[in-house]
Amino acid sequence: MESLSKVAVIGMGKIGTVLATNLVKSNHAVIIADRTPDKAEALAKSLGKLATPRDVVAAIKEADLVILSVWFETIKEFFKKYSVELQGKIIIDPSNPLALAEGGGFKKIIDQDQSAGQLLSALLPKGARLVKAFTSLSAESLSNKAFQQPERAVMFYASDDIGLKDQIEPLIRAVGFEPLRLNGISQSIRIETFGDLAEYGGLGKTVTLAEARAKL
């Protein structure tokens, strides 16, 4: 088993719950937090001793990698509220800039040529570094397509800091996927919903490593 930095998952919605659950399935410890503490405590109880509930401040302080699994529209305020705690942290952003559309489905809430990753990278607290990951697949696929055999499904990620590879790729493998890095946060738009490398976009499905590389 690869060594893994201390991980906190903040936000116990569908994505956050799946990521925390998958980490425990891989026998990795995870810190979990939610603005509603009872949700984090209930999930930790169901996952067992590898999951530790904390309040948001404590979760950030204790972790090296912070998976911020909250709605895109709330992240700017989150950065402001926890700017001191987030200094120097590695922040993993799985958000998609979406809202419910009239008649069903989702619509993009930023300009078509913008990405959540690029917008958030300009708002980072001092010394924090951003990685865009876990955004190209639905919560259902993050659960059902994890740990596939004999070949794992790919999880794309984007970051301007290639030096984060040794921390991010073990995390992605621990969640049950094969990591594949894109060239910087500017590529976030490709892996966010409607992007050409997204399940709900150009790909229409999960892909193997060979299939993914053919799309780059």
Language model regions located:
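NAD(P)+-binding Rossmann beta1-loop-alpha1 motif at the extreme N-terminus of oxidoreductases
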Residues: 1-49
